[in-house]
Amino acid sequence: MKRGEIWFVNLDPTFGHEQRGRRPVLIVSPEPFNRVTKAPVVLPITSGGKFARTAGFAVPLTGAGTRTTGVVRCDQPRVLDLAARGGKKIESVPDAVIDEVLARLAPIFE
């Protein structure tokens, strides 16, 4: 599990405003962390995400050269055990996408 990989996973159970259902997620935590914890920090990818788009928390995958479409929701980080949730690696994003995602994620933790 490496930063920049897209996995397809079941996010349920969820509560309230959390993204739900089976969907792609982007791994944003570094590989050494993922190796030790077996539970990477991920961001959901959605075709909706109106709030994230208008609030500046969405990074579009349009033009990134990925089969996965939609936007990465930088406002919804989660730690998931991908194996326990039946996750499957789909593909990886280019470095430019992960750089933009990390730049939009950073202010949340300041």
Stretches with model-predicted labels:
Residues 1-110:
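Conserved functional hotspots at enzyme active or ligand-binding sites that engage polyanionic ligands
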